[in-house]
């Protein structure tokens, strides 16, 4: 359904003026509340024989931004789809480069998508609600998973302690 979607494939072909597009990866991102923007970043490029499966991400990005490995670079179009609307959670991106003003895709995001080159375009997630009066601090080992009590809620646990609970409808998908 997702990797072979006709409109997404057509958008990828048009974006690169290409004749062939081969879908290869599907990620699903669930985002609970974050009160600050995530860092602006680029995703991980792929080169002939080199991907994040066998090469550190910092090295892949260095290879990409140096321009020295362009002839081995595999062009990738990324389709980011939003399945629901939540408080906040917009997508800020710099299609004209980091020296220009960003654009933002926010509000009314359910069942929308953007197709582009997220391996070469800086982007970031804007704050996602629901917003609390106090920050919820967790470590990098925190996990988001369905609650095991049958409530249908999702919980963020950190070190075995529940730090945040929310219905799935409030999680950015």
Language-model features, listed with the residues they occupy:
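Signature of the catalytic double-stranded beta-helix
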Residues: 1-72
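A generic short-segment signal for beta-strand/edge and adjacent turn/coil regions
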Residues: 44-52, 59-62, 80-85, 139-148
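A structural signal for well-ordered alpha-helical segments within the folded catalytic domains
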Residues: 2-10, 77, 109, 119
